[in-house]
Amino acid sequence: MGSLAKIVAVAAVLAALVAGGSCGPPKVPPGPNITTNYNGKWLPAKATWYGQPNGAGPDDNGGACGIKNVNLPPYNGFTACGNPPIFKDGKGCGSCYEIRCNKPECSGQPVTVFITDMNYEPIAPYHFDLSGKAFGAMAKPGLNDKLRHYGIFDLEFRRVRCKYQGGQKIVFHVEKGSNPNYLAMLVKFVADDGDIVLMELKEKSSDWKPMKLSWGAIWRMDTPKALVPPFSIRLTSESGKKVIAQDVIPVNWKPDTVYNSNVQF
């Protein structure tokens, strides 16, 4: 076979592979969105892990929810990237799940993880890409590293209510770049459902106005007219519960600043 014929033959083979979708494992469509149906039923999923073996996942201890320092309390590195029906375009940020595995190295005891990041690997209807610490925590004592050597395996999961120790209240972080005409806030440490489906803002002497979900757990308000502080925030959880953080953002608010509320679900 001449060189030109060889090139044509190779090109034909490559085209057939691409057309037939033969590159890589088959894609699995995502399952239905996980809701606040706390019925205790365990569901099947795939588990992987990333980052440092005993780390919180991302090297910057952050993630697609916008939450930072997930290696520190109250998350303590027990975090996970959820695939689309778990992450839900950011509306799953902060939700909590129990996970357990049944390998010989597994303890069989459930481990609770917080959703702080996303993954779009189409390997299963439900997929948890766990921090190394959370993955290893499913093991029997002393077998953490051996369990992590699997890299990927089947597990069971169920959604649970989020619980924070020590009377932790909801916290708001006014994001960098915020100004009187653009206000962006990260909300974190939400108990019970853990996630928020609606965030509303009330200026001084005004009515409630809905904010827009910007990305992850960050909500924003854009307005041509300067916002007048102090700002109250009303949160609605996935199950419809509401709390109001009255005047939580003060008159002299600043961007890139944390404001603690005195409310919790």
Curated annotation (Swiss-Prot):
- Gene Ontology biological-process entries: plant-type cell wall loosening; sexual reproduction
Primary residence: secreted
Q: Where is this region: Immunodominant T cell epitope?
A: 123-142, 177-196, 240-259
> Which SUPFAM superfamilies does the entry mention?
Barwin-like endoglucanases, PHL pollen allergen
**Chain positions covered by the region annotation Subdominant T cell epitope:** 150-169, 213-232
Superkingdom as given in the UniProt entry: Eukaryota
| Keyword Nucleotide-binding applies | no
- The disulfide bonds in this chain are C65-C93, C96-C162, C101-C106
Q: How is it used?
A: This protein has potential use in diagnosis and specific immunotherapy (SIT) of grass pollen allergy for patients living in a subtropical climate. The diagnostic sensitivity and specificity is 92.4% and 93.1%, respectively, for the detection of Bahia grass pollen (BaGP) allergy in patients that have sensitivity level of 0.23 kU/l of IgE for this protein. The immunodominant T cell epitopes may be suitable for safe SIT for individuals with severe allergic symptoms to BaGP.
The residues that carry sugar chains are: N33
Q: In which tissues is it expressed?
A: Expressed in pollen (at protein level).
Q: What are the record keywords, sorted?
A: Allergen, Cell wall, Cell wall biogenesis/degradation, Disulfide bond, Glycoprotein, Secreted, Signal
Signal sequence, start to end? 1-23
Q: What does this protein do?
A: May cause loosening of the cell walls.
The name of this protein is Expansin-B1
- Identify the species of origin: Paspalum notatum (Bahia grass)
